A protein has these predicted regions:
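Positively charged n-region of N-terminal signal peptides that target proteins for export
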Residues: 1-4
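Sec-dependent N-terminal signal peptides
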Residues: 7-13
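C-terminal segment of classical bacterial N-terminal signal peptides
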Residues: 15-22
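Active-site-adjacent loops and short helices of periplasmic peptidoglycan-processing enzymes
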Residues: 24-175, 184-188
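Acidic/histidine-enriched alpha-helical segments
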Residues: 83, 189-203
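Hydrophobic "lid"/C-terminal helical patch
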Residues: 181
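Single conserved hydrophobic/aromatic residue that forms the stacking wall/gate
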Residues: 205-214
């Protein structure tokens, strides 16, 4: 019951974020353009408004990115390190997007990439994870994301990147993202990553001292 309640609250809060200003006002459903609350166990829709409207998900995209990374890792994060590619860093040039200043050629522990992507909304971290679960390039990771969308039978979602930077071909609906979150919560380690609100990590390539990702 505790897990179910937490999942439902997470879904509600996620979809209130679709509306500018919603964070300041709180989750007032009457003022929310679109939302979808589901039963995390069954997928049954409990309440909704415009749940199939296609919207730009922004960083909510990272729910899928983190879910696929956790699925591949299967809870075995120890000693897994990822090498930062040129594309991870320089594909974000000029976007003024959130990042953790990864550097090409650096080795990053998988666990740090996961938490940085979730807690700092790091787009370079999301790129790194996409290469990890895609087995090659960022594009391979995006293809895996869209393959998962198809496997889940979702009709109103398409991803063009793993982080959520605006693109005409990058969209989802409240219903689809609720189902993506439901699936992601079933992946080993995802719930811990998704609900963590503070972590210290030592990223030596940006700072010699522990960095607070909260």
């Amino acid at each position: 019951m505790k897990k179910l309640t937490a999942a439902l609250c997470a879904v509600l809060l996620v979809f209130c974020m679709f509306v500018p200003g919603a964070a300041a006002a709180g989750p007032a459903l009457g003022a929310t353009r679109a939302y979808c609350i589901i039963d995390a166990d069954t997928g049954l829709v409990l309440a909704q408004q415009n749940m199939d409207e296609e919207l730009h998900p922004a960083s909510i995209t990272k729910v899928m990115t983190l879910g696929l990374a956790c699925e591949k890792a299967q809870g075995d994060w120890d000693d897994v390190k990822l090498t930062v590619s040129h594309e991870d860093v320089y594909s974000l040039a000029g976007t003024d997007s959130s990042h953790i200043a990864l550097r090409e050629g650096e080795e990053v522990p998988l666990v740090d990439a996961l938490y940085a992507t979730q807690m700092a909304s790091a787009n370079d971290g999301a790129n790194l994870l996409a290469e990890y679960f895609g087995g090659g390039t960022i594009a391979d990771g995006v293809a895996a994301m869209n393959a998962q969308v198809e496997e889940l039978g979702l009709a109103h979602t398409h991803f063009s990147n793993p982080h959520g930077i605006s693109d005409e071909d990058h969209y989802t609906s409240c219903y689809d993202m609720a189902q993506i979150l439901r699936w992601a919560l079933q992946q080993p380690g995802f719930e811990d990553v998704f609900t963590r609100n503070q972590m210290y990590t030592c990223l030596l390539y940006t700072s010699p001292s522990p960095r607070d990702l909260s």
